[in-house]
Amino acid sequence: MTASSVLLHTGQKMPLIGLGTWKSEPGQVKAAIKHALSAGYRHIDCASVYGNETEIGEALKESVGSGKAVPREELFVTSKLWNTKHHPEDVEPALRKTLADLQLEYLDLYLMHWPYAFERGDNPFPKNADGTVRYDSTHYKETWKALEVLVAKGLVKALGLSNFNSRQIDDVLSVASVRPAVLQVECHPYLAQNELIAHCHARGLEVTAYSPLGSSDRAWRHPDEPVLLEEPVVLALAEKHGRSPAQILLRWQVQRKVICIPKSINPSRILQNIQVFDFTFSPEEMKQLDALNKNWRYIVPMITVDGKRVPRDAGHPLYPFNDPY
């Protein structure tokens, strides 16, 4: 039986399986949170840009707190600072909006969602006439210093990064008085992220995998892309262990001590996704899954510019995915 959480350098325990809420529609996410809490989840991953924190807050208000089903101190809640709120003056108001929406007094973890800043304001995707994004020059190191104030004020217990590469992580560490505790990135057997995970672990950061099942429900999905849940190695292990393909993918991660936040609104899949602590893979089975790595990235935000689909931010100097890791 594997431990079901990792210890952050802050002393907090972070559950290895959490419920992801990206692409969970309002009208569905409240029920999903309640199903997850009753299935034993104690980790919820949110973000202001997902547009559903108000409804998540309704579920938390009904289920979490003194005299409710789940004591607040048993729940680990993550949210993320969006790109339009990187200016130091905008950081605390953005967090306070998230806290108000989630109906919480503090967050367990607050992540910078991306390394680059968009133009300030309340439109999450400010665009030029040709469809390209309008950026802001605020550097993530300035944003980080503003995030540190939130810890001092007791509004956030730990800070972290999302979609940063190894060089950018070290850049943040060079100015940090509050060290990042977690890096959240896309990660699954097709994008194993071994170098990046080793880099993080050597510096005291834990790693959370988003889209651990391969994210086949994205709007910009390519018809020819590989489908992770149909990978023959995964299907063979699922049959051998009497498990679902999703459980195979999640077990591989938790056995590597990588946190996962699979998104689901389906009660039976929500339950299935946390039932990964009562079986283990042999070293040979882990090697079979490790061998699937092809550095295949599903999550590259796309936009339409002059009628063509192009990566949204690939030309930005702080775009994280041009480096090897």
Curated annotation (Swiss-Prot):
N6-acetyllysine-modified residues are where? 127
Just give the chief location class.
Answer: cytoplasm
GO process terms (BP): aldehyde catabolic process; cellular detoxification of aldehyde; D-glucuronate catabolic process; D-glucuronate catabolic process to D-xylulose 5-phosphate; daunorubicin metabolic process; doxorubicin metabolic process; L-ascorbic acid biosynthetic process; lipid metabolic process
Q: Which domain of life is it from?
A: Eukaryota
- Supply the Gene3D superfamilies for this chain: NADP-dependent oxidoreductase domain (3.20.20.100)
Q: Which Pfam families match?
A: Aldo_ket_red (PF00248)
Give UniProt keywords alphabetically.
Answer: Acetylation, Cell membrane, Cytoplasm, Lipid metabolism, Membrane, NADP, Oxidoreductase, Phosphoprotein
Q: Which GO terms describe its molecular function?
A: alcohol dehydrogenase (NADP+) activity; aldose reductase (NADPH) activity; allyl-alcohol dehydrogenase activity; glucuronolactone reductase activity; glycerol dehydrogenase (NADP+) activity; L-glucuronate reductase activity; methylglyoxal reductase (NADPH) (acetol producing) activity; S-nitrosoglutathione reductase (NADH) activity
Q: Where is this site: Lowers pKa of active site Tyr?
A: 80
Example GO CC term: the record gives: cytosol
Task: Identify this protein by name.
Answer: Aldo-keto reductase family 1 member A1
Lineage of the source organism? Eukaryota, Metazoa, Chordata, Craniata, Vertebrata
